[in-house]
A protein has these predicted regions:
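Conserved ATP-binding subdomain of kinase catalytic cores across diverse folds
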Residues: 1-19, 28-55, 62-68, 73-186, ...
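Short secondary-structure boundary segments
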Residues: 11-22, 105, 215, 219-228
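Short, exposed beta-strand "edge-strand" segments with a Pro/Gly-rich flavor and a Y/T-containing core
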Residues: 61-63, 222-223
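Acidic catalytic cores of enzymes that act on phosphate-bearing nucleotides/polynucleotides
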Residues: 187-261, 271
Length: 328
């Protein structure tokens, strides 16, 4: 089959529209090989299933495990445990849309490919930028990417060994980074944006997304990010999701143009907190934002539907179950 027809079929299978419709997701994917890779996880699994990507069979003799499914450099980041009122900042996978029970080599392969694509993506951004500061920043070399890929595999094996020894478990996490580490500055920024941090009221997710000048607390009016919801529909959504959150839903908006792979999926932001709350730091940290998103089948399962009975859970439950195992 002509390659473009395979791509077309896989995009239509997942997104339920052809590229000719020019949805935002496909436009974003067309702008960069890295973005295309991020938005086409199902295509990779199709290529694995038909043998176009040749993975050594010996790797399939290893036990199945929880996998991210769409494991790439863009799906890791800093998150505070327990939302805004958590006091632990961890570095971990942060997107589980395609998580399921699967073969660990799929995550390792996908992440390794993403290292090379992200390096090229950043190189292209730098070469085509008019920003002198950006053009002068050091760029990761291909040799460094080679070293990073090998280090990633080594650390995975090391983590497996520690798990067997009992020194690594689902309560373990990356929580600190020394000054020489590439993530140190971002870790410090994350700490400042947490509740109690110097930048909590200016740079935290709550501060960026909420209108802190008005009472009661509400999401900002921002046509680029949020779509207001008709009052009756908003009331229905808040009533429907109230049993699943740990406090009162104070407001609800539809989030626009977020993500890449799931860019075309409807999603909502819920503001959750005490019924009576104001915008000062002592009370704002009692609130948090919950993302509610339409969930679809994990990408590996289109081509590998019989890996595990656990994968027969509905898509939302499977995602949550895997996230519990993978995010710590």
């Amino acid at each position: 089959m002509i390659r473009k027809n395979t791509i077309r079929e896989q995009l239509q299978l997942v997104d339920e529209v052809t590229p000719e419709h020019s949805i935002n997701k496909h436009i974003k994917m067309a702008s960069s090989p890295f973005f295309f890779f991020r938005g086409s996880a199902a295509l990779m699994y199709q290529d694995i299933a038909c043998g176009l990507i040749d993975i050594p069979q010996a790797l399939y003799t290893l036990p199945l495990t929880n996998i991210v499914g769409d494991c790439h450099t863009g799906n890791f980041g800093f998150i505070s445990e327990e939302g805004s009122h958590g006091d632990t900042l961890i570095f971990a996978p942060n997107d589980f849309d395609d998580a399921c029970i699967g073969n660990m080599i799929w995550d390792l392969f996908r992440f390794t490919v993403s290292l090379y694509l992200s390096q090229k993506h950043c190189q292209n951004l730098q070469e085509n930028s008019d920003d002198l500061k950006l053009r002068q920043k050091p760029l990761v070399t291909e040799q460094q990417v080679d070293s990073a890929a090998l280090a990633f595999f080594d650390q995975y094996l090391h983590a497996c060994a520690r798990s067997i020894e009992g020194t690594l478990n689902n309560q373990s996490a990356l929580t600190e980074f020394d000054k020489e580490h590439i993530l140190h500055k971002r870790w410090q920024k994350g700490l400042q944006r947490m509740a109690g941090g110097a930048a909590f009221l200016t740079s935290s997710t709550l501060a960026k997304e909420l209108d802190l000048t008005k009472a009661p607390l509400r999401f900002k009016t921002n046509p680029q990010r949020f779509e207001p919801i008709p009052e009756q529909h908003k009331s229905d959504l808040m009533k429907h999701f109230s049993p699943y959150v740990d406090n009162t839903i104070l407001d609800c908006v539809e989030r626009l143009n977020a993500g890449t792979g799931s860019n075309n999926m409807r999603r909502y932001y819920l503001l959750v907190g005490p019924k009576q709350v104001n915008s000062d730091a002592s009370q704002l940290n009692l609130c948090h934002i919950v993302e509610v998103k339409q969930q679809r089948r994990a990408a590996p399962l289109h081509n590998f539907p019989s890996l595990s009975p656990i994968n027969e859970l509905n898509a939302a439950h499977l995602t949550v179950n895997c996230q519990r195992k993978l995010s710590t």
